[in-house]
């Protein structure tokens, strides 16, 4: 009985040991993240990587202001539609905006050869200047042909500003030949057309010659054209058609034209220079007084986030497009609430069972209990290293996704609808690959982050254990019971790593011997009890066997024969 009393007394005294615990911060955040191995892991803090807001306006970029074509299409500007006179004197732009409505483009019905390539060429330049190429006053033809299909802003018959409709003069249309040399230091884009009358009578009426031949040649092209005469459906009041062509005349090159009818001859060309973003947007957004690094068809996006889910088509340095509406990067700790019913030191588990809501000055820290009371303090060094690491992780994700990739919205004609379909599929597949890479990267980083936080707490725990050495007992739950009296100054030295274990070595050794002695007494007591129990059990069993044997003999059920 004395042994049990001594054991109880010493164990009770052990609960009075000064104690220091290692743990981490927890808060009331409801944020969760996904990792490679877990879904919806609670964390104290996250960074949303997908930007969703947008300002519905048009802004300039570092290359300048956009060219907003309110009433004209790009084709109308290039051909010189008479209702696009506003753009005759040349323009400069960073990108082009067309409105999603019927625009003034090709006024006399017909089609432009390689139209999408012409649009792409013009959208990629920065500015143009109109240059005179041919002077038709020297030609023995009429060069003032007009059409009601190409009315000007006064609703009077007119024609393209970049070309001349050549017709007979004095009842004749002799063969006309002329040439132009590009003496400028930039390319010149020029256009021409071939007229296809609806009837032979109109052919003769306009050009005298029933069978004509026109040619346009340079060192790179050699084109000859004959009209296809015949009636066609009425479009813009016309049964005739025009096929439109274009070419690029490089510096030093010469273009030669020859015709005896049906040629819509080039008069002005466009001297093109510089490079723009090479994009054509189509929207009704208003123009703002602003400059942006990221312009989408839907508006302006100003953000430092690496991803957006608004549009895959953009201009400038925009976040990568991913279909996902949210992608969260963990930049805090695993958010495990403290066990509430155990009190501050009832069984603090630190990094094992839960965090501390009272740890507000850092991510990792200490709680202690001694004769002076209890206290909590953050470990600023490990916290700062972790915060710096989180910022590096965020920058790492941004850098890995910073390789600019633009999905260019190629424009193909109806004839090339299959190419358009293939292009769209390729765009979608590339976008899916980017989205998969982004999600996988974030899952990996989240996994590493949570693992690193666990390691940081363990490292802090190991640091304290190395400082205390044999002067404390590791209770296995993130806490240490100190085998000597440790006031607040002593606790500070443990936290900052200046603790001198030799100063308390003797006191701790004596206390540890007491603890070990109690354990020995306890073990001896248990051994004696075990022996007593075994002997008593054996005696009882032996008595039961003997009693059964005697009972059997008395009843005649057992017969004993002794042989000598």
From Swiss-Prot:
Lipid moiety (S-palmitoyl cysteine) attached at: 553, 560, 563
Q: Name one GO biological process term.
A: fusion of virus membrane with host endosome membrane
| Signal peptide, first to last residue | 1-16
Keyword list (alphabetical) reads: Clathrin- and caveolin-independent endocytosis of virus by host, Clathrin-mediated endocytosis of virus by host, Disulfide bond, Fusion of virus membrane with host endosomal membrane, Fusion of virus membrane with host membrane, Glycoprotein, Hemagglutinin, Host cell membrane, Host membrane, Host-virus interaction, Lipoprotein, Membrane, Palmitate, Signal, Transmembrane, Transmembrane helix, Viral attachment to host cell, Viral envelope protein, Viral penetration into host cytoplasm, Virion, Virus endocytosis by host, Virus entry into host cell
| Key word Membrane present | yes
Transmembrane domains' residue ranges: 531-551
User: Membrane side Extracellular: which residues?
Assistant: 17-530
Q: Which GO terms describe its molecular function?
A: host cell surface receptor binding
**Post-translational modification, as annotated:** Palmitoylated. In natural infection, inactive HA is matured into HA1 and HA2 outside the cell by one or more trypsin-like, arginine-specific endoprotease secreted by the bronchial epithelial cells. One identified protease that may be involved in this process is secreted in lungs by club cells.
Main localization category: virion
Which GO cellular component terms are attached?
Answer: host cell plasma membrane; membrane; viral envelope; virion membrane
Q: Which residues lie on this side of the membrane: Cytoplasmic?
A: 552-564
Glycosylated residues? 27-28, 140, 151-152, 222, 302, 309, 496, 523
**Disulphides:** 21-479, 59-290, 72-84, 107-150, 294-318, 486-490
The function of this protein is: Binds to sialic acid-containing receptors on the cell surface, bringing about the attachment of the virus particle to the cell. This attachment induces virion internalization of about two third of the virus particles through clathrin-dependent endocytosis and about one third through a clathrin- and caveolin-independent pathway. Plays a major role in the determination of host range restriction and virulence. Class I viral fusion protein. Binds to sialic acid-containing receptors on the cell surface, bringing about the attachment of the virus particle to the cell. This attachment induces virion internalization either through clathrin-dependent endocytosis or through clathrin- and caveolin-independent pathway. Plays a major role in the determination of host range restriction and virulence. Class I viral fusion protein. Responsible for penetration of the virus into the cell cytoplasm by mediating the fusion of the membrane of the endocytosed virus particle with the endosomal membrane.
Subunit structure of this entry?
A: Homotrimer of disulfide-linked HA1-HA2.
Q: Which family does it belong to?
A: Belongs to the influenza viruses hemagglutinin family.
Q: What is this protein called?
A: Hemagglutinin
Q: Which organism is it from?
A: Influenza A virus (strain A/Duck/Alberta/60/1976 H12N5)
């Amino acid at each position: 009985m004395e042994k049990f009393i001594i054991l109880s007394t010493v164990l009770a005294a052990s609960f009075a040991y000064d104690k220091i615990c290692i743990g981490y911060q927890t808060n009331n955040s409801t944020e969760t993240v996904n990792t490679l191995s877990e879904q919806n892991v609670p964390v104290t803090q996250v960074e949303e990587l997908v930007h969703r807001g947008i300002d519905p306006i048009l802004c300039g970029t570092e290359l300048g202001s956009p060219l907003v074509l309110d009433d004209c299409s790009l084709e109308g500007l290039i051909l010189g539609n008479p209702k696009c006179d506003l753009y005759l004197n040349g323009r400069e732009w960073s990108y082009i905006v067309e409105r999603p409505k019927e625009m003034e483009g090709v006024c006399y019905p017909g089609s432009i050869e390689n139209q999408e390539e012409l649009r792409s060429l013009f959208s990629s330049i920065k500015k143009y200047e109109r240059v005179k190429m041919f002077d038709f006053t020297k030609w023995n033809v009429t060069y003032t042909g007009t059409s009601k299909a190409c009315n000007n802003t006064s609703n009077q018959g007119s024609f393209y500003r970049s070309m001349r409709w050549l017709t007979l003069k004095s009842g004749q249309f002799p063969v006309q030949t002329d040439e132009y040399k590009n003496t400028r230091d930039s390319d010149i884009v020029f256009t021409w057309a071939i007229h296809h009358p609806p009837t032979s009578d109109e052919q003769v009426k306009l050009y005298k010659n029933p069978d004509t031949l026109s040619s346009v040649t340079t060192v790179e092209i050699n084109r000859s054209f004959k009209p296809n005469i015949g009636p066609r459906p009425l479009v813009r009041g016309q049964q005739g058609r025009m096929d439109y062509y274009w070419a690029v005349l490089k510096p030093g090159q010469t273009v030669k034209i020859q015709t005896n009818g049906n040629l819509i001859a080039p008069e002005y060309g466009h001297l093109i220079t510089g490079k723009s973003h090479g994009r054509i947007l189509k929207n009704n957004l208003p123009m703002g007084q602003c400059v942006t690094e990221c312009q989408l068809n839907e508006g302006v996006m100003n953000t430092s986030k690496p991803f957006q889910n608004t549009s895959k088509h953009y201009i400038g340095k925009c976040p990568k497009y991913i279909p996902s509406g949210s992608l969260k990067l963990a930049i805090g700790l695993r958010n495990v609430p403290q066990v509430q019913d155990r009190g501050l030191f009832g069984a603090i588990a630190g990094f094992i069972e839960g965090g501390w809501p009272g740890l507000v000055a850092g991510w990792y820290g200490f709680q202690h209990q001694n004769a002076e009371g209890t206290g909590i303090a953050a470990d600023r060094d490990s916290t700062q290293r972790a915060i710096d690491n989180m910022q590096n992780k965020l920058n790492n994700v941004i850098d890995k996704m910073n390789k600019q990739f633009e999905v260019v919205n190629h424009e193909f004609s109806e004839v090339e609808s299959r190419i358009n379909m293939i292009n769209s599929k390729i765009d979608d597949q590339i976008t899916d690959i980017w989205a998969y890479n982004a999600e996988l990267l974030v899952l990996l980083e989240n996994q590493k982050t949570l693992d690193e936080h666990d390691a940081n707490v363990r490292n802090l725990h190991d640091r304290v254990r190395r400082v205390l050495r044999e002067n404390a007992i590791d209770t296995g739950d993130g806490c240490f019971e100190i085998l000597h009296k440790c006031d607040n100054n002593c606790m500070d030295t443990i936290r900052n790593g200046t603790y001198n274990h030799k100063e308390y070595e003797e006191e701790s050794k004596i206390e540890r011997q007491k603890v070990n002695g109690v354990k020995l007494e306890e073990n001896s007591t248990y051994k004696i009890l075990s022996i007593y129990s075994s002997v008593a059990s054996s005696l009882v069993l032996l008595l039961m066997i003997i009693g059964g044997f005697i009972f059997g003999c008395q009843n005649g059920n057992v017969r004993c024969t002794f042989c000598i």
